[in-house]
């Protein structure tokens, strides 16, 4: 069950001028499930995207990468669930291209203007014929419906919106959806994220902004430490709000727009953790006073992805030596353990290389029983900090993944 996460209504997710959404039941996932989504993009829009670092990246990832920078510009994104089209060799690419061609015919653009995305079971052929047959049957959809259509093991559709001033006079809107519940780990995971904004941004600048936003949001979460074959995060800028184009990172509007979109993306990223497979708790791990941000993130991830730490949280067991052990093996060079302080929420648990004299088991138990917990580690060796978001590891995670294909 998702941790403090509820489904957004259509009214909470405003339309973005220049974007049209469509969904259908293609029969790829399971009969009766909406499993196909098409995001139609107005001509003149720009698109930025980042993808998985998994060497076995899926066929649609290869195709999407090549179509992203095509001089004709992106006009559509087509997303299927139920099949990842990964580990499918040359035929997988042929199938992905066939889907692009069919989607292009549907909306009246070139095949190279369509970016394909897939999520689901790996090492199974993509039933491209089912997707192609369903495309003409697609119906207009709202953002909340599109969010549900891209789900796999998710239990709650993930969507969010933002509105704010960018520049002196223009109000910018942005709405996004994401999916992900398991195989979640930085760079990125079994996660798909799509954000659309009516701001006007040049493609090179939008690409850089997309990379920065992904690093600050989706690359700060972990559910199980597995990096998927299909991760993709996309930002579409339609330019329909009449502002002049942001074509330089030195433009003050760049930082304003990035802040707005970063806030939206972080909500989506945290929603993925809140809906982690079998999750019962949402945990924030913050490492402070590190020498570098990379060092801080490295230590935070060591604690956040430890199965022993995560199962202790599930059991509400203040066996907090597991956290100290994780920081110890995080490979922080020349770490002086006598300087390290560890807090559970605001309770000092460890200092001077051991248990704090003021700490009691009852204090730890009280915090561990909550459904949202913050772990704070102070290394006292610099000014850098990093925050990572994770969840506990429950019996539910094992059951969901053991039964995934049944």
Swiss-Prot record:
Give me the residues that bind substrate, please.
152, 179, 190, 277, 401, 406
Q: What residues correspond to the site Cleavage?
A: 189-190
**InterPro entries (UniProt xref):** Arg_biosynth_ArgJ, ArgJ-like_dom_sf, ArgJ_beta_C
**Which pathway does the database say it acts in?**
Amino-acid biosynthesis; L-arginine biosynthesis; L-ornithine and N-acetyl-L-glutamate from L-glutamate and N(2)-acetyl-L-ornithine (cyclic): step 1/1; Amino-acid biosynthesis; L-arginine biosynthesis; N(2)-acetyl-L-ornithine from L-glutamate: step 1/4
Gene3D superfamilies (UniProt xref): ArgJ beta chain, C-terminal domain (3.10.20.340), L-amino peptidase D-ALA esterase/amidase (3.60.70.12)
The broad enzyme category this protein falls into is transferase
Q: Where in the cell is it found?
A: Cytoplasm
Primary location:
cytoplasm
What PANTHER family does its record include?
A: ARGININE BIOSYNTHESIS BIFUNCTIONAL PROTEIN ARGJ, ARGININE BIOSYNTHESIS BIFUNCTIONAL PROTEIN ARGJ, MITOCHONDRIAL
User: According to its UniProt entry, what is the function of this protein?
Assistant: Catalyzes two activities which are involved in the cyclic version of arginine biosynthesis: the synthesis of N-acetylglutamate from glutamate and acetyl-CoA as the acetyl donor, and of ornithine by transacetylation between N(2)-acetylornithine and glutamate.
Instruction: Report the protein name in the record.
Output: Arginine biosynthesis bifunctional protein ArgJ
From which source organism is this entry? Answer: Neisseria gonorrhoeae (strain ATCC 700825 / FA 1090)
Q: Which gene encodes it?
A: argJ
